[in-house]
Amino acid sequence: RQQADVLEQRYGVRILLSSQCREAAALSSYPITLSDTMDAEAELNGVRAVLTAMDRSFALYPEGFLAQFRNRAGEGGLCFLLVAHIDSDYGVVGCTYDTADWQYIALDVQADYMREGTVCHEIWHATENEILSRDYTAFNWDDWNALNPAGFTYWNDSGDYDRYDARWTMFDNGEGVYFVDSYAKLAVQEDRARIMEYFMVHEDEAGLLIQSDAR
């Protein structure tokens, strides 16, 4: 808890641990399992690892950026929930959802990979939510879709998600690079979040996106 308190004070966010997450977790559209269901040692190690990743990730943002999610009265803002599991069809290890005053970000403490990337990915979702809450026209669909391959449809619109489809991604040696990976083709929001995730923590790979004639 002390490690979380330091991050709260330093970055102007709220961090909930274990059973503290119960009320906020119930607001998510995904079923969330709290970390107090885990073995005590595994919970402690997982929470410590994610808090360390959060510290490294938060340091990448301009000073005061994360605190700007608070409202004009200085209330609400970014609230992180460190949990045991997020139940979804896509195997997500983080999810973001909002209320009038809070942007909630749940992070799976059992996921031992891409921790910093996941934090930055979810912070972008919260950022996009915040932007749209202030100006719902901020992202022009036609302008964005014009950057995609001709005739492309995101999978959440077609209902046909294939996690192994590497076409137009950085992992395909064929056509131009339009997307980071197959998950970026799930939804426009995931596309943007994947790009921001790679710009923040995967500098070398992000260079491939920047250099691509397609993008």
Question: Which sequence ranges carry the predicted segments?
Answer:
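Non-catalytic architectural context of zinc metalloproteases
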Residues: 1-52, 85, 156-168, 172, ...
